[in-house]
From Swiss-Prot:
Function: The glycine cleavage system catalyzes the degradation of glycine. The P protein binds the alpha-amino group of glycine through its pyridoxal phosphate cofactor; CO(2) is released and the remaining methylamine moiety is then transferred to the lipoamide cofactor of the H protein.
UniProt-listed CDD domains: GDC-P (cd00613)
Family listed: Belongs to the GcvP family.
Residues annotated with N6-(pyridoxal phosphate)lysine modification: 686
Keywords of this entry: Oxidoreductase, Pyridoxal phosphate
GO cellular component: cytosol; glycine cleavage complex
Coiled coil start-end: none
Cofactor dependency: pyridoxal 5'-phosphate
Taxonomic lineage from the root: Bacteria, Pseudomonadati, Pseudomonadota, Alphaproteobacteria, Hyphomicrobiales
Enzymatic class: oxidoreductase
Protein name: Glycine dehydrogenase (decarboxylating)
Length: 937
């Protein structure tokens, strides 16, 4: 279809054109779109009227409208600190990583062979963290500082097998951190017990420095905690760690903190990565992803996700955490910042910040003004003697924001954007002059120069080198900028450039989340509109945008249900019914919310076993808290009895939690609240176009009925509590992506997108059914937006496994569909509405060709031990090897689709990765250069 500047955005977002859709419907065997939708989607849930949303805007109109809204923000220079700091984003990183679709459109690196670039960068992130903390193992990022501290508490509880129930503090953490920890602790019966340490203490949380900016003397508390068997958790500023001793040397078992000030804008609260590092004995208790080094089938080094058996998609309610999506893109950005500056540069930045803080403190003291603490990194807390608000108001008039702690104290946090002019202006507010110089006040022995000695942190200081490093890593990966990613239950749709552009605007990127409310008028207007649109789309009465991942949305929704029952004097309602086919985050979230999980069987056709559901609901009627279910189901079909299911749970006094993972099959056709749900989370990084970022960021807002609205997450800075994320609006700076998508699509465009997603899935299913039976089908043999291909037929006929198929798809230039979920040995395919018909056809032809290759193995044309399927993927080095001994040709290996004359070939950098070896010999960070030098001597 020819497009022009007047073409509606929906026609650019949706891949198949009018003629394509007509051809696809013919293959499916229906005369019209409406016929297919009426066959697939039960009439009982269909919307009677169109959604009430603004008429669609063009890209230019939407950008102009959003720009005008965000211009209402007042972005002053922030000295608020409290975990959020101004940064200079290196342009080479902003342009070549943050704004590069090769980086931001990739999926979580489950398929190691096509993810080596971002796995290598995350491995470098882990190395960075282990070097800063002195602890041997670090994860590949968590969601933010507050949730990272809560996860650290979880590690301590699991370490003590849930037999200890107290958490103590040494130094005061940031208020938002304490609030999130309290939120996590309360459902589990954990007591936040101040400074008291005894034999029931699971963890001591050491703030390094504390929220006042002070490095306290915590040696006695640490010694007491260790004597009592409690784990010591350091909450440490990573930039400050370039100047101080590593937490491990100070007694830490765990260290956590935010990586935001490593080149990631504040963004009104996020997203940014947090880090988590642990001692060796705690490795298997760590939350989130862990990248490890292994080897491929040829003995070459390669990276992979390690120890996945501890994660939610494997262990479910027994998992170490409900974390699924983390902050991979932002962790990669922070790593690039460390690579760009190197250890000397990081120390220079930290040293300059430290000097500014000490010069202010010295100058104030000389003028007779009291400051708190003798040892600090970047923050000076000043005694204002009742004039804190007055001083902050005077600072604001100069274009600077200070932190008012109470009527008598003001906090001033310096960062890499702070200047001598700022220092002088702030000192003058107190009638003082900054000292011309000041001695370092970091505690203990200063960190030396011997850290981050690995070559990657020392060899990329020119922009040419850095640009090429980022390009080299991106070229190793397969993202949406290269080809379709048909992952079922993941909705890898287009992340349009117009949606992404605003994220880099200063009016969006540079605002502190705790700036005065009047300064965030633009953000609050945009957020208010977005909440209203999401309420209209889902049918709920209220929406919270605070949860910064789908897993956190689940948790927030279950906490709302829990609080509702308790408000009615029914705190005994703690049983959560969950179908056996549910996403792994569901049972993990229920366990975190203090609920006990009761699994409900599914039938062979994939539907929930309603007899078992009724029996379980009857059995647990008095204690029933909730049902968690996904719709359409994780089997890719619209179950007929959704309304009856919700009514059944309500009859027994329970609430219905609707998992919105598959909302892309419902938008503008049906609404969860109308079906009977009480709460639902929405993955904005699926249905609403926020990119996956190679494993994050994500946003998982929840919608609730009116009776649950009082129990939505609050925030200490907004006069409430029970937060689930560090910032009031979570990952606020990426919310404009979803705002832009909805604004440009309009109600009709959103409906067309949903219909096209269903058409594309049924088209792929119809084409592939003769070769791979569809495991589940709904009425009229239709599916929703995804299908499960029973690839076990190739295992039975030829010995070819689902792994072999997935790896062979790499040779065809595709990321594999979702493997072995929800059924082992199968592939779940979700094409989304964004893929053009020619790409769908290319995928179908690849799958059909693979079935043909398996037939050759079955006939004996190729031996099972040596064929292009079991040897896949094929690297360029293997294909060009001087001696070729395989029974198939080099062209069959590398260009199975017969496209050797094209320039679009994707070459995997490694052959098949050995997963077992990687877990048996866990290597999760790069050794320092001294290890190599020592080995060579």
């Amino acid at each position: 279809m020819m497009t022009t500047a007047l073409t509606p955005f929906s026609a650019r977002h949706i891949g198949p054109g009018v003629n394509d859709v007509r051809a696809m419907l013919a293959v499916i065997g229906v005369p019209s779109v409406e016929t297919l939708i009426s066959q697939a989607v039960p009439q009982s849930i269909r919307l009677d009227l169109p959604l009430t949303l603004p008429a669609p805007a063009s890209e230019a109109e939407a950008l102009a409208e959003l720009s005008a809204i965000m211009a209402k923000n007042t972005v002053l220079k922030s000295f608020i600190g409290a975990g959020y700091h101004g940064v200079h984003v290196p342009p080479v990183i902003q342009r070549n990583l943050f704004e590069n679709p090769a980086w931001y459109t990739a999926y979580t690196p489950y398929q190691a062979e096509i993810s080596q670039g971002r796995l290598e960068m995350l491995f470098n992130f882990q190395t960075l963290v282990t070097e800063l903390t002195g602890l041997p193992v670090a994860s590949a990022s968590l969601l933010d500082e507050a949730t990272a501290v809560a996860e650290a508490v979880g590690i301590a509880l699991r370490h003590h097998r849930d037999k200890r129930t107290k958490v103590a503090f040494a130094g005061t953490p940031h208020p938002q951190t304490l609030d999130v920890v309290r939120t996590r602790a309360e459902p589990l019966g954990i007591e936040i017990d101040g400074e008291t340490i005894d034999d029931n203490t699971a963890a001591l949380l050491v703030s390094w420095p504390d929220t006042l900016g002070v490095y306290g003397d915590h040696k006695a508390a640490i010694d007491k905690a260790r004597a009592a068997g409690a784990l010591v958790v350091f909450i440490a500023d990573p930039l400050g760690l370039t100047l101080t001793d590593a937490p491990a040397k100070l007694g830490a078992d765990i260290a956590v903190g935010p990586m935001q000030r490593f080149g990631v804008p504040m963004g009104f609260g996020g997203p940014h990565a947090a880090y988590c590092a642990v001692s060796d004995r705690l490795t298997r208790l760590m939350p989130g992803r862990l990248v490890g080094q292994s080897t491929d089938s040829k003995g070459r080094p390669g990276y992979r996700l390690a120890l996945q058996t501890r994660e939610q998609h494997i262990r479910r309610d027994k998992a170490t955490s409900n974390i699924c999506t983390a902050q991979a893109l932002l962790a990669n950005m922070a790593t690039a910042y460390a690579i760009w500056h190197g250890p000397a540069g990081l120390q220079a930045i930290a040293g300059r910040i430290h000097a500014l803080a000490n010069r202010l403190a010295s100058g104030l003291k000389a003028a007779g003004v009291s400051v708190l603490g003798a040892s600090r990194f970047d923050t000076v807390t000043v005694e204002a003697k009742g004039k804190a608000a007055e001083i902050a108001e005077a600072a604001e008039k100069t274009g600077r924001l200070l932190r008012v702690l109470d009527a008598d104290h003001v906090g001033i946090a310096f960062d890499e954007t702070s200047t001598d002019a700022d220092l002088d202006a702030i000192a003058s507010l107190f009638g003082a002059k900054a000292a011309p110089s000041a001695d370092s006040t970091v505690p203990g022995k200063p960190r030396g120069k011997e850290f981050l000695t690995q070559p990657v942190f020392n060899e990329n200081k020119s922009e040419t080198d850095m640009m090429r490093l980022l390009r080299r890593l991106a070229d190793k990966d397969l993202a949406l900028d290269r080809s379709m990613i048909p992952l079922g239950s993941c909705t890898m749709k287009l992340n349009a450039a117009a949606e992404m552009m605003p994220v880099s605007w200063p009016s969006i990127a540079d605002l502190h989340p705790f700036a005065p409310a009047s300064h965030s008028a633009g953000y609050r207007a945009m957020i208010g509109e977005l909440e209203g649109w999401l309420s209209e789309i889902t049918g709920f009465d209220a929406v919270s945008l605070q949860p910064n991942a789908g897993s956190q949305g689940e948790y927030a929704g279950l906490l709302a249900i829990r609080a509702y029952h308790r408000s009615r004097g029914e705190g005994h309602r703690t049983v959560c019914l969950i179908p056996s086919s549910a996403h792994g985050t569901n049972p993990a979230s229920a366990a975190m919310a203090g609920m006990s999980v009761v699994v409900v069987r599914c039938l062979e056709d994939g539907n929930i076993d309603m007899d078992d559901m009724r029996a379980k609901a009857n059995e647990h009627s008095k204690n029933l808290a909730a049902l968690m279910f996904t719709y359409p189901s994780t089997h890719g079909v619209y179950e007929e009895g959704a309304r009856h299911l919700c009514a059944l749970i309500h009859e027994h006094g329970g609430q219905v939690y609707f998992d919105g993972a598959n909302l892309n099959a419902l938008v503008a056709l049906a609404r969860p609240a109308d079906i009977g749900a009480d709460v639902c989370h929405m993955n904005l990084h699926k249905t609403f176009c926020i990119p996956h970022g190679g494993g994050g960021p994500g946003v998982g807002p929840i919608g609730v009925k009116a009776h649950l609205k009082p129990y939505l997450p609050g925030h200490v800075t907004e006069g409430s509590a029970h937060a689930v994320s560090a910032a009031p609006f979570g990952s606020a700076s990426i919310l404009p992506i979803t705002w832009m998508y909805i604004r440009m699509m309009g109600a009709a465009g959103l409906k067309q997108a949903t219909e096209t997603a269903i058409i594309s899935a049924n088209y792929v299913a119809t084409r592939l059914a003769p070769h791979f039976p569809l495991l589940y089908k709904g009425r009229h043999d239709r599916i929703a937006h995804e299908c499960i291909l029973d690839t076990r037929v190739l295992k039975e006929s030829a010995g070819i496994s689902v792994d072999d198929i997935a790896k062979r798809l790499i040779d065809y230039g595709f990321h594999a569909p979702t493997m072995s979920f929800p059924v082992a040995g199968t592939l779940m395919v979700e094409p989304t509405e964004s893929e053009p018909k020619r790409e769908l056809d290319r995928f179908c032809e690849a799958m059909i060709a693979i079935a043909g290759e398996a037939a050759k193995v079955a006939r004996g044309d190729w031996p099972l031990a040596d064929n292009p399927l079991v040897n896949a993927p094929h690297t360029a080095a293997e294909t060009l090897a001087g001696q070729w001994t395989h029974p198939y040709s080099r062209l069959e290996a590398a260009y199975p689709a017969g496209d050797a004359d094209t320039a679009a070939k994707y070459w995997p950098p490694v052959s098949r990765i050995d997963n077992v070896a990687g877990d048996r010999n866990l290597v999760c960070s790069c050794p320092p250069l001294s290890d190599y030098l020592g080995a060579a001597e």
